[in-house]
């Protein structure tokens, strides 16, 4: 069923409780309260353009899947609360910030450039497409649920990843390939962030709070810590790099200035690992392997 839009402005919320579409030829969808709320309990498609009249947030709630298929014009926040938002085309979210709270943003092979990204037990998956950040990435701890990013993640500029500390072994897992000629700083949040992709970003990796944990060995010139020669800095109290049983496929220079009691360089895994990159001690630091061996061959 298609619900045609007869005018460019609506008042109130939209409830989708069956397989309905919201469409409008040459029509822009707006809300007079400057906010659009879609309550989805079924699968649906919004092919009308959501215009600049929506200055406030566009919020998707419910258990259904909503597909945006137009290049939308609004630049405010997009909040996905437990629902699934699927991109039916590229650039459906314009440049606004995105919050995923227990839901999913599925780019479905398309690409999009957004603002800042906040995940609270949320999932972003791109398929063959790429989501490019226009701001920093923040995850908020939510009990026993990790935040997940899969596919391809473009940095767009130097970025800070702020990871909240929850009950999971890994508070956030990014298996997406991270790309861009920029730096990555894990800052502020005390949570555990896992990088599990063969990342191609070319800037310095800095860990200034919490733990960055490896989830892959890397291949060729790419590693979970970016391309060869970037360097990684563990800096400040409470920061650590956990090899997690993975021996990097290439050498990565490492500078340790961290003072985390469990070790600035760790191996919290039963597997023995080798670290073959040059390690420089910028301050007193601890290197520890709680389970398997940690062999250092270049210091």
Predicted regions and their residues:
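Short regulatory "switch" loops immediately downstream of catalytic or recognition motifs
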Residues: 162-165, 213-219
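Short loop/beta submotifs within extracellular cysteine-rich repeat domains
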Residues: 85, 92-94, 220-222
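Glycine- and acidic-residue-biased ligand/ion/polar-headgroup-sensing regions
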Residues: 64, 80-85, 189-192, 207-212
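Extracellular, surface-exposed repeat architectures
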Residues: 1-65, 69-70, 95, 99-192, ...
């Amino acid at each position: 069923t298609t619900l045609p839009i007869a005018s460019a402005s609506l008042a109130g919320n939209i409830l989708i409780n069956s397989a309905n579409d919201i469409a409008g030829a040459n029509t822009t969808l707006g809300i007079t309260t400057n906010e659009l709320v879609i309550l989805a309990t079924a699968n649906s498609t919004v092919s009308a353009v959501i215009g600049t009249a929506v200055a406030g947030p566009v919020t998707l709630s419910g258990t259904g899947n909503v597909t945006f298929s137009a290049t939308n014009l609004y630049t405010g926040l997009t909040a996905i609360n437990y629902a699934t938002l699927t991109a039916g085309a590229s650039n459906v979210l314009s440049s606004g910030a995105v919050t995923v709270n227990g839901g999913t943003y599925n780019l479905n092979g398309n690409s999009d450039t957004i603002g800042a990204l906040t995940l609270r037990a949320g999932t972003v998956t791109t398929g063959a497409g790429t989501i490019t950040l226009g701001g920093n990435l923040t995850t908020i701890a939510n009990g026993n649920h990790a935040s997940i990013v899969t596919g391809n993640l473009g940095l767009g500029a130097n970025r800070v990843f702020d990871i909240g500390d929850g009950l999971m072994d890994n508070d956030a897992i990014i298996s997406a390939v991270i790309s861009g000629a920029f730096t990555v700083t894990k800052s502020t949040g005390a949570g555990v962030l896992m990088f599990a992709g063969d990342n191609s970003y070319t800037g310095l990796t800095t860990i200034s709070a919490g733990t960055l944990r490896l989830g892959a060995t890397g291949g060729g010139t790419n590693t979970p810590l970016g391309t060869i020669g970037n360097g990684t800095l563990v800096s400040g109290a409470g920061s650590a790099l956990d090899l997690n049983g993975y021996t990097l496929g290439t050498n990565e220079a490492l500078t340790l200035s961290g003072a985390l009691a469990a070790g600035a360089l760790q191996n919290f895994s039963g597997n023995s690992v080798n670290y073959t990159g040059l390690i420089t001690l910028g301050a007193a630091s601890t290197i520890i392997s709680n389970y398997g061996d940690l062999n250092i061959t270049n210091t």
